[in-house]
């Protein structure tokens, strides 16, 4: 039985990857950080009590900032595959906490690679590094492919660039099977609420049911290549099953604006909207309502505004990946469209919003946490 070690297992990608590997018959080990509150909601459904007979899923406390912990865990587990998905992954937060972002995202990758090397597992353990399309930043060509020069535009992207190149360096220096997946934006109902797609679908659901008045966004002209996390974790696994390690772009090859994702999300909730104004004065107004979900929304309501607080210090205007290498060499193609992904996300957030609305209607004090 193959053994896999996943950092970031409590996140969106980690939870989907754990499901995928368990279905493949793997023994899955995940590293989770100690928290004062429960942070395992995405993996509760696959959790196995260690007292059960022959469990295949194990959680370990650890942190990418703790060298000795990583060395010990790699020694104890002796993994066949490591998927380094753990990171401080929010671009805006990286401007507020640049040192922490560098420590986790850059040095954390080095610590994990060193844990493999120090334990003498260079030729046993295969290593996958979750890289990012943010490396391209101020894009040098469209679309972006494996050979496109990097131009990072945030502390997060700079940290991830170090992680990318140290992974390449360990592959070339020590003969490790180590590779980078350059992941373009990928979403799902498990996406964190502060990331723009989930922020949008959650707010639209809340607005439809009268739990929120208005959604505030930054640059709505931003173009992104959005795929589904399920498709992307499948590609991550495929990358470690090849004869030779290579780096791959993981993307759909299609892009839409943030504005269009808002429109798409609203339509899934039965709300038609019209945009007007420009720049910080742009708004979206409800023009029609066509679904029973939107019980509290009214035609004429302004439900989207621009807030300059959400502009990045250095903006990344467009990201569009070219996944042709993945298709040609691995046979990978994304199976879930952005429209299907959006519908799934809105449906999930509507279900949650309906529960909150029901509690509120029956006299319970329900507060909806909104991004500041």
From Swiss-Prot:
What InterPro entries does its record include? GDP_Man_deHydtase, NAD(P)-bd_dom, NAD(P)-bd_dom_sf
**Which keywords has UniProt assigned to this entry?**
Lipopolysaccharide biosynthesis, Lyase, NADP
Identify the metabolic or biological route this protein is part of: Bacterial outer membrane biogenesis; LPS O-antigen biosynthesis; Nucleotide-sugar biosynthesis; GDP-L-fucose biosynthesis via de novo pathway; GDP-L-fucose from GDP-alpha-D-mannose: step 1/2
Catalyses which reaction(s):
GDP-alpha-D-mannose = GDP-4-dehydro-alpha-D-rhamnose + H2O
Q: What is its EC number?
A: 4.2.1.47
Where along the chain is the active site annotated? Answer: 132, 134, 156
What biological process terms from GO does the record include?
Answer: 'de novo' GDP-L-fucose biosynthetic process; O antigen biosynthetic process
Q: Which GO terms describe its molecular function?
A: GDP-mannose 4,6-dehydratase activity; NADP+ binding
Coiled-coil positions: none
Look at the named UniProt entry and state the broad enzyme category this protein falls under: lyase
Record Gene3D superfamilies: NAD(P)-binding Rossmann-like Domain (3.40.50.720), UDP-galactose 4-epimerase, domain 1 (3.90.25.10)
Detail which positions bind NADP(+). Answer: 8-13, 63-64, 85-89, 100, 160, 186, 191
The record's listing under Pfam families reads: GDP_Man_Dehyd
Q: Which cofactor does it need?
A: NADP(+)
Give the SUPFAM superfamilies listed for this entry: NAD(P)-binding Rossmann-fold domains (SSF51735)
Task: Give the function comment from the record.
Answer: Catalyzes the conversion of GDP-D-mannose to GDP-4-dehydro-6-deoxy-D-mannose.
Family in the record:
Belongs to the NAD(P)-dependent epimerase/dehydratase family. GDP-mannose 4,6-dehydratase subfamily.
Put simply, this protein is called GDP-mannose 4,6-dehydratase
| Source species of the chain | Yersinia enterocolitica serotype O:8 / biotype 1B (strain NCTC 13174 / 8081)
């Amino acid at each position: 039985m193959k053994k896999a070690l996943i950092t970031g297992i409590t996140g969106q990608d980690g939870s989907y990857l754990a499901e995928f590997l368990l279905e493949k018959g793997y023994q899955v080990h995940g590293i989770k950080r100690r928290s004062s509150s429960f942070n395992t909601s995405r993996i509760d459904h696959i959790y196995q009590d260690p007292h059960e007979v022959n469990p295949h899923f194990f959680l370990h406390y650890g942190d990418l900032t703790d060298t000795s912990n990583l060395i010990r865990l790699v020694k104890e587990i002796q993994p066949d595959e490591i998927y380094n998905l753990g990171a401080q992954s929010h671009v805006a937060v990286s401007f507020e906490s640049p040192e922490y972002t560098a420590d986790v995202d850059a040095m954390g990758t080095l610590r994990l690679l060193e844990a493999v090397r120090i334990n003498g597992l260079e030729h046993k353990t295969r290593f996958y590094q979750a890289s990012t399309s943010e490396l391209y930043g101020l894009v040098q060509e469209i679309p972006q492919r494996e050979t496109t020069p990097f131009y990072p535009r945030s502390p997060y992207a700079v940290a991830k660039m170090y992680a990318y190149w140290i992974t390449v360096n360990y592959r070339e220096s020590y003969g490790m099977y180590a590779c980078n997946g350059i992941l373009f934006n990928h979403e799902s109902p498990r996406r964190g609420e502060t990331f723009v797609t989930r922020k949008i679908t959650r707010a639209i659901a809340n607005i439809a049911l009268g739990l929120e008045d208005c959604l505030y966004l930054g640059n709505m002209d931003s173009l992104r290549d959005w795929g589904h996390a399920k498709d992307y974790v499948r590609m991550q696994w495929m990358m470690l099953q090849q004869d030779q390690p290579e780096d791959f772009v993981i993307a759909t090859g299609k892009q839409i604006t943030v504005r269009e994702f808002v429109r798409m999300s609203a339509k899934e909730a039965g709300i038609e909207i019209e945009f007007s104004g420009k720049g910080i004065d742009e708004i979206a107004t409800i023009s029609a309502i066509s679904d029973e979900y939107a019980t509290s929304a009214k035609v004429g309501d302004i439900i989207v505004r621009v807030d300059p607080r959400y502009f990045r210090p250095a903006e990344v205007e467009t990201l569009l990946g070219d996944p042709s290498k993945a298709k040609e060499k691995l046979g990978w193609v994304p199976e879930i469209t952005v429209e299907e992904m959006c519908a799934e996300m809105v449906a999930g957030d509507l279900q949650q919003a309906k529960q909150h609305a029901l509690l509120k209607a029956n006299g319970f004090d329900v507060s909806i946490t909104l991004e500041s």
